[in-house]
Amino acid sequence: MKIKADAKLSYPRDVVFASYRDKLVELVPHLPNIKAIEVKNREDNEGVTRMLNIWHAKGDIPKVAQSIIKPEMVCWEDHAKWNQDDWTCEWKVVPKFFTKNVTCSGKNHFVEQGDETVLQIRGELEIDAKGIPGVPRLLAGRIAPVIEKFIVGLLTPNLLTVSDGLVKYLDSNKG
């Protein structure tokens, strides 16, 4: 399943890029579906920054998935490679549940548009429900779309609310 979202931010690209990369933890109060973000690792090297962040989400688990997904499992690793030379961020999301069954990755482009920035988020999510503990083989085909929709339902709005949160953060730190 494709993930595609665009956000226009009323700040210059260099400010948006650096703030998105460096101030993510400070955005949590502005992110309604996120409980916390933990920076686990950061490596800076000649215009490229590699990061590992752990995101902890808020969200209701669908009834059909409650026997499989526990509330403490609704978090994910965010592996990111920020490249300032081409204003991109390659990312890979690894959920704490169904790690071997879920593949999610993509690339964000920070596009300059005058004094503003357009953040283009592009990615792909794939789920294989076969082999997930607790999922009967005969139901795997029916449950996979529910789980996929749940994960995309958590990720996509958060991708856009991060941009909204970033604008609120930048607005509150002007001057």
Regions found by a protein language model. Name each.
Residues 1, 72-74, 102:
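Residue-level preference for beta-strand/loop junctions
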Residues 1-64, 70:
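Hydrophobic ligand-binding cavity/cleft-lining segments
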Residues 2, 40-43, 96, 103, ...:
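Soluble, non-transmembrane catalytic domains of enzymes that act on hydrophobic metabolites at membranes
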Residues 40-49, 54, 124, 149-164:
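Subset-of-secretome marker
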Residues 51-52, 76, 81, 90-149:
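Beta-strand/loop substructures that line and gate deep hydrophobic ligand-binding cavities in soluble
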Residues 62-85:
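Helix-adjacent hinge/juxtasegments
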Residues 84, 137-175:
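A conserved amphipathic terminal alpha-helix motif
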